[in-house]
Regions:
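N-terminal basic/disordered segments at the start of proteins
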Residues: 9-79, 164
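Cap/lid and interdomain-hinge subdomains that line or gate substrate/regulatory clefts
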Residues: 36-50, 80-82, 93-122, 126-259, ...
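N-terminal short beta-loop-beta anion/metal-coordinating cradle
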Residues: 57-87, 356-362, 437-455
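Short acidic, glycine/serine/threonine-rich loops at helix termini
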Residues: 58-61, 133-137, 167-175, 260-265, ...
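A structural-propensity feature for long, helix-poor, extended segments
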Residues: 82-90, 448-484
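Conserved, well-structured core segments that form the ligand-binding/active-site neighborhood
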Residues: 173-357
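Short, flexible loop segments at boundaries between secondary-structure elements
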Residues: 280-307, 438-462, 466
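C-terminal structural cap/anchor segments
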Residues: 358-419
Length: 484
């Protein structure tokens, strides 16, 4: 059942082992993915508005759009898939830009939906470490749906879990796996994000914090592992069905079965008339779409490369990415080039610096794999918006470099490391408009996109979040791509 909560200042909990975190929990209630697929068959299409491209990491054979023209949305609605993604990239925008982009997508989607006769339900995909424009995005989606005649939103369901990456929620407290064990996300480097920082790991208090007190922690409905595992889908559907007036519910999950119980409950509640919006991490999408976890793509499934060497673009500056780069260097066979942030911020040097790096990298690509990366030390502005503007400028420079390199020499593959980096590389450097997310290179992480048309057709595009995988993950992904 829902449980009352009492917001307090967060007390650091520190690390604990995963075994300690999971000890004493109720037995998992097994739900096959096929049961969810049957429950949603013929129902509303799940449309995921992805605030950066890394939300596709848990799914396979799902359409992805990087543009939201009505024709593109109609194409996605016609595909034989229980869900599709629209890459909004709003995590890289300020609040006003994010709000306007969400409005544009919903208005075009409503038109496309009516033209195709296919109804939909919306999920706003945010970061599993709780960064992004919440509650702004779900507020805008609710307003636009109401304006389109879809009625008011009964509830907003927050499900940040990302199972493969070790982002787990237990007793409404959200944890992340680290090299030292499980850590509450509010004590991680991601909680200190210059743009989307926060203090609380406990989701009801996090909701109160992010809504600036508009929603109190005591008013947040908590759906716990006891609800999911002991009482099951019908009970949880009742909790969801009781939501009114856009009330927020937060949901525990430590495994895919928990999310499939939730998916069944959501389908039941929706079939009974509940109008729900979802703010979710990557794992909920797979469960709600009725997909089971799939093995990573094999070298044979990737097919023969069209060129001898690949390009790796690295924009993420988090510590994990830096360690992954170190391991990739140890593997050898790389030429590495840096875009210096200080030179990029100098209007007199910027263009020449990008041109110099691009020319050298394109030449090296004929001989070996190439890494083009930004300065590893993050440069911040005076406030959150200024920091975001610097990030956008650096990302734009990386995009210019990738565009120039690939125009000169076709790579065997392109890996984009970091959320903003992977979005801008897809849309601006490679001009990907429609693609299929075919699967992952590593278990549950690192999505491979197959562009449908355009200059990137035939080039595997790998979306690699800055904050996922072990220290060897980038080297492992490159090793697989080299083995084709």
């Amino acid at each position: 059942m829902s449980h009352p909560t009492h917001p307090t200042a967060p007390v650091p909990l520190g690390h604990r082992t995963e075994a300690e975190l999971l000890a004493g929990l109720p037995p998992v209630r097994a739900v096959p993915a096929g049961e969810v697929a049957a429950a949603i068959s013929g129902g509303r299409r799940l449309v995921v508005l992805d605030d950066d491209p890394t939300g596709t990491q848990t799914v396979a054979d799902v359409p992805v759009l990087t543009d939201w023209a009505v024709d593109d949305l109609r194409w996605a609605l016609r595909q034989d898939s229980g869900a599709f993604f629209v890459l909004t990239n709003t995590r890289s925008l300020d609040a006003a830009g994010a709000a306007e982009r969400n409005r544009q997508v919903v208005r075009a989607l409503v038109e496309a939906s009516r033209a195709e006769g296919v109804d939909f339900v919306l999920a706003s995909r945010g970061d599993s470490t709780l960064r992004g424009h919440f509650p702004l995005e779900t507020d805008v989606l609710a307003d636009e749906l109401a304006a389109a005649g879809a009625g008011g939103t009964d509830g907003v369901v927050v499900v940040p879990a990302y199972i493969e990456a070790g982002r787990l929620t237990v007793d409404s407290l959200h944890w992340m796996r680290t090299a030292d064990g499980m850590l509450p996300v509010g004590e991680s480097e991601f909680a200190r994000d210059a743009t989307f920082g926060y203090a609380h790991s406990r989701l009801p208090e996090w909701v109160e914090e992010k809504t600036a007190g508009r929603t109190l922690a005591v008013d947040v409905v908590r759906i716990t592992l006891d609800d999911l595992r002991v009482h099951g889908p019908e009970h949880v559907a009742g909790l969801l069905g009781a939501l009114r007036g856009g009330r927020t519910a937060v949901v525990d999950a430590t495994c895919d079965d928990d999310l499939r119980v939730l998916a069944l409950a959501c389908a039941l509640a929706e079939s009974r008339g509940s109008r729900l919006l979802y703010r979710v991490g990557p794992s909920f999408v797979r469960a709600r779409a009725g997909q089971a976890a799939r093995a990573p793509l094999s070298a044979a499934e990737l097919g023969a490369p069209a060129a001898p060497h690949g390009l790796i673009a690295v924009g993420s500056h988090v510590g994990l990415t830096t360690r992954q780069l170190d391991r990739l260097r140890e593997a050898g066979g790389l030429a590495e080039f840096e875009l210096d942030v200080r030179q990029l911020m100098d209007d007199e040097r910027r263009a020449a610096h990008i041109a110099e790096v691009s020319e050298a990298a394109a030449g090296a690509l004929a001989i070996q794999d190439v890494v083009v990366r930004t300065t590893r030390t993050v440069v911040t502005g005076a406030d959150a918006d200024a920091s975001l503007a610097i990030s956008r400028g650096v990302s734009a420079a990386l995009v210019e470099a990738v565009r120039a390199i690939t125009a000169t020499r076709t790579p065997a593959f392109v890996i984009a490391k970091g959320g903003i980096t992977s979005s801008d590389t897809a849309t601006e450097a490679l001009e990907i408009r429609r693609a299929w997310a075919r699967g992952t290179l590593l278990p549950g992480i690192v999505s491979l996109w197959e562009p449908v048309a355009g200059p990137a057709a035939g080039i595997p595009y790998i979306v690699f979040a800055g904050n996922v995988g072990g220290d060897d993950a980038l080297a492992d992904a490159v090793r697989l791509l080299r083995s084709r």
